[in-house]
Amino acid sequence: MNRNQAIIASLCYFSVFIAPIIVPIVAYFVVNEKETKRHAIRSLISHIVPFVGWLFLFIALLGGAVAIDGDSLLPVFVIIGGAVIYFLVVIGIIIWNVIQGIKVLRAA
């Protein structure tokens, strides 16, 4: 992998901050190098995971809002617990993307 391809691959990981899904898709279809495509797919998957988690959290929020009654606080704790777990996973994914982006740049 040459320097330019390493920069493109690292941009796929760093795009978690700006245009998370668009940059890896564009890199995958524009670049012909196999290693850069592999990094684009890995970063795309890591960018899609928080979106899917957000959908589950949103569905749980809607279901919890319907299930809340005056006697039980369980749905509230489930929603808050789900949100905390979601945000911890998102922070972990962001850290993983930054580490992978730095690794790709250092390897080049």
Swiss-Prot record:
Its membrane topology is listed as: Multi-pass membrane protein
Q: Membrane spanning segments where? A: 10-32, 45-67, 77-99
Q: Can you supply one Gene Ontology CC term for this chain's record? A: plasma membrane
Q: Does the keyword Membrane apply?
A: yes
Keyword terms = Cell membrane, Membrane, Transmembrane, Transmembrane helix
Give compartment(s). Answer: Cell membrane
Q: What is this protein called?
A: Uncharacterized protein YvlA
Corresponding gene?
A: yvlA
